[in-house]
Amino acid sequence: MVDKPKHRAADGRALDDKGNPVVDEKGKPILDKNGNPLKPDYTKDFSFKLGGRIQVDSQINWNGNGPYGTDLANGVGFRRARIYTEGVMFRDYEYRFEYDWARNNGGTQGITDAYLKYIAIPNFAVTVGQQNEGKSMESVMSNNYLTFIERSLPNNAFIEAGPNSKYQIGITAETWNKFALDKDWAMPYTVRGGLTTESVGAPGPGNSSGNSQGQTNNAGGTNSNGTNINRNAFSGDTSYQVVGRGTLAPFYQKDVGVLHTGVWGSWRSVNNNYNTDGTLRTGGWAYQSAPNTDVDRTNWINTGNLSSAKVCAVTIKGTCTAYKPVKQVNNVAMFGAELAGAYGPVHLSAEYMQAQIAGYGYSGSDTLQGFSVQGGVFLTGETRPYDVKKGTWDRLVPNNSFVGGSGWGAFEIAGRYDLMDMNTLHINGGSINTGTLAVNWYLTPRIRFMTDWVHVFSVNNNNSLRAAGGKCAFPAQGSGAAIGCFSGLSPDIWEMAVRLDY
């Protein structure tokens, strides 16, 4: 969070030089004892903060019973290595810029956040620039606060490692408040929505403006938005989406508990850019996910690009003069539902999400979907904090941090079950379900050791309705049709991680 200047309260209201709000909660000026309006203190209109995070993961696998090429890699690597600057300028504007030097989530771009936010109106903000698109309770939450080393399968497939990074250029508006029932019990809510396009330099089918297919364009060279080379050389327009999320906590009492509900949805127009011979140049759409792993991010489920090359429709004198699409995704509609709660040391959460694919070669039955259920308990008695402004979990502060020998920090045990199904009538993306057990040690609010044991219960990448897409080829490649090689495998994965932010 940005360190707010001292002239502004937590709810955004300006303060005078003594720290008193100059307007009430309805925006009406507050008068001093002489009947004059209190004046804001503008002596500290600017703030600056520099910070970052270092996250290191390790992975050991037991899955040597599969075909050649399906073994997951053991190893150690940086999950994230970020540095950021943020603050407030001219009293009413918040800024943030963050760069990830590791960017090990399936993307190559380094920029995560790069935005300007207007915060002058209490409980309201407008953000312009690259920002989190705002889908899912788990994805809106900072990865500094995650219970598990990796987010759930559907979250990873649809949002985190989807066809477009969740950090997208756009404009969003948000509001938050609470229905105060008494001094201790309130019903906080959030509403956020806007228009987003694509990420800065995002690779893959989700980026219609770069040569994500690695093909040569008609100008004789390759084009990638990641290097910002000649966007007009047949690179295509950017896609766009309308997205929104709303949350309500029917029960919330700080340091006691919360009951959270939420829904979100989006509609994205997908661009498909073709060469003159009907082959796909850029664009399209695809979903994929690894089995809750990071060091080895092989995609065990993968739809492949849902747009394919066109076929010849009209031939004149042996030359094709017109083409027609066979498989072409034109738009994707997504929906998600959230339910979470915490009381005392126990916390639970569940999410469901789906993506409806529409276009040539697809029907109303082509809906990809997944869900996750997770829960945990703090053995040292802490209650999981709730962020009322974002409608998600907040940073845990141990009752007794492991500092100077005065305490042992906080200990947490947790479990999760998740499932992702991307097999439909016309899509053979595969299905997978896993279980995860976790033990976390929070030494301080900003230093944490994590260990997860992941078991893959089943993988089914052989859809009989489209058998060709599920066949096993050698060597197995997670990004191609060879995902069929993973069918029937049930590996165990041990992961360990260190999380530090400052």
Model-derived features with residue positions:
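Extracellular/lumenal/periplasmic "stalk" regions immediately C-terminal to a signal peptide or transmembrane helix
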Residues: 1-4, 8, 17
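Short linear proline/tyrosine/threonine-rich motifs used for host-factor recruitment
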Residues: 12-23, 27-31, 37, 320, ...
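Outer membrane beta-barrel
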Residues: 16, 34-222, 227-271, 367-405, ...
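Outer-membrane beta-barrel pore domains
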Residues: 21-22, 43, 115, 265, ...
